[in-house]
Amino acid sequence: MSALPRSAFQALAGPSPVPLRLTAFLIGAVATLFATLHLYAGIYGAPPAMLFRMVHLTLALALVFLAFPLGRSWAEPWNAWTILDALGFGLSVWLTWYYVATLDGWALRQVMMSEVDLFAAWATLILVCEAVRRTLGPIILIVAGFFVLHALFADHFPGIFYGPPARPLTLLRALVVGDGGIFGAPIAVMAQYVVLFILFGQLLALVGVGDFFLRLAFSLFGHRTGGPAKASVISSAMMGTLSGSAIGNVLTTGAFTIPLMRRLGYRPAFAAGTEAAASTGGMIMPPVMGAIAFIMAEFLGMEYVEIVIAAIIPATLYFLVIFLAVHFEAKRTGLGALPKDRLPVTREVLRREGYLLFPMALIVGGLVAGFSIVLVAVIAIAGAFVMGFVRRATWPTPIRVMEAMEGAARATASLSATAAAAGIIIGAIFATGLSYQVTQGAISVAGDHLWLLLAMSGLMAIVLGMGMTASAVYITMVATVIPILRAAGVPDIAAHMFALYFGVVSNITPPIALAAFAAAPIAGANPLAASVEAAKLGVAAFVIPVMFVYQPALLMIGDPLTVIWSTASAAMGLTALAAAFVGYLVSPLSIPARLAMVVGAFMMIAPEGATDLMGLALAAGAAFVDHRFSAGRAWLGWGALALFAVAMELIGRQHLQSRDPALWLALMAGLSTLLVAMAAGALALGRRMTSRMPA
């Protein structure tokens, strides 16, 4: 049996049955039209906003019914369900024509709808639901269905969910005709920005950027301790920011890095977890950050470059923790590195392929220069296209370019169905005022305890993420959770970044961690074990959002000194947390030392500046005592450290309340003693480690 074609244009180029050729022709035609339309709009300006959104969504729906048929792959023979696929495709094409032809009467539908208008609205609603079910499964439909039922029967719900119900026709108008439902902000972002950047990512893949990132990462880190895993982290970060898909990143870079980690002795679950955590982090890594950053900029009414700047420190901290966790694991298990003679030379990689960084430089330069995000995307696409001509093997031939367009259209079709479903959720929530009721109810339950609101919000995001994409989780949280955080006084960008992180982290959160589940078969690992390892490695993603809610300086808000201090404190705390989870710092850590380091880590992470030095002392002291002394004598050291840290914490809090100079002197004396002891211990540890090194 011959292999199925990977693209519609490949099917058209070879000897294929007539039904397959017809399907491939339709997919190729719709995908090319879809990509060309958005590229034209990016260069010459988009048509009227509502028209652009409607054409975008209906063409995306048409592509979904072609590329995601029932009961088979698109390239397999037709079956009994093909008639439904054809019906969905035909209705989508008809809706495209209908919305374009009747655009002038769109505003009138807010107050009066004809029978044909009603049919078109119901058809749009049903097609969106079926498209989401085909591409993402039933989870988001269940969530959307709950909010629609609530809107219709709000007077039958208890507590904060009680309210006046919406009439069916009023709700239908809110979901389909209004600009706050299916054709609202999420679809607007998809049509204006996301398609162009996905096309940019497809063109980069065409010219070999993925292989270049892998070679560059391995040339830099392959020969170091834990080299393959570190290279996986770096390459996944670079590719993930372009692809915007954690699962897609796992399946591309992971296909190379995971088997290599396995051959060098890494546990299957750890290899899969490393790739999943790194690929997930690509979605929070500037400058592209996947689709969510564009949606966030739209909701916040901010420039995209402001979102990018705010994301730099949290993303750096996330990858720092994964990088260190991989290093600690390699040290703990005694895993080596790749021989240098088996690795590419960094200078040669950059000399031969460094030009592939040019499109990325165009994005950064365009954003810094203040160009519009659409113009930046168009320039980057042109740069990627031109770079393809440097090597004969990557020439952007017409077939390759059309395959890139097809890939971009397929990816966007799935995302657009998700955005439309999220629009249903938002429209249903605002049709009944549920958002306000939930906000007031949550604040009354949590009272003045912001941490409780954050815990409730994070848990909700994780539950929603069990089967929903990060974009869908974020958009749902915009309507449900973010108003709660804003009402509690959290800065707007911190509230939205909180939602972003917890929307992304669902990819590595058991029991349904989609990125880890995608990596597990490649590594031959148990999916649940892989998801647990991914969550451990990506623990920073659960902590960092809470940190920047309490310390907005981590989002570049505030004076430079505060930003530097908060970043340094967070980095030290997260390093201690990574070491505690792995069980290694400069030597293996015992359970008491790991517990002490967790306590010290959270003291450094806490927003009060007085706790930073105490937490650092506790974590560093625990590691030193554990490394320097035998198990029996170490218990005394751990106990003394714990008592000292508690005493300093109590004195510090009392001083903050009373401002007593005597307490201040006691605090300073204690901290000075501790710093001197830490310095002496560090010197002793350094001499001991140096003496063990071979000459």
Task: For the regions a language model picked out, list residue spans one by one.
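Conserved, well-structured core domains of diverse proteins
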Residues: 1-111, 118-122, 674-690
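Membrane-interfacial loop-to-helix junctions in multi-pass transporters
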Residues: 115-119, 180-193, 220-232, 264-270, ...
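Long, contiguous bundles of hydrophobic transmembrane helices that form the permeation core
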Residues: 2-22, 32, 309-411, 514-605, ...
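Core transmembrane alpha-helical segments of multi-pass membrane transporters/permeases
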Residues: 130, 135, 145-154, 160, ...
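Transmembrane helix-loop boundary segments of multi-pass membrane transporters
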Residues: 44-54, 80-84, 109-113, 293-294, ...
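Hydrophobic transmembrane alpha-helices that form the pore/transport pathway of multi-pass ion
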Residues: 214-282, 292, 301, 470-503, ...
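Transmembrane alpha-helix interface/packing and boundary motifs in multi-pass membrane proteins
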Residues: 201-205, 236-245, 277-283, 367, ...
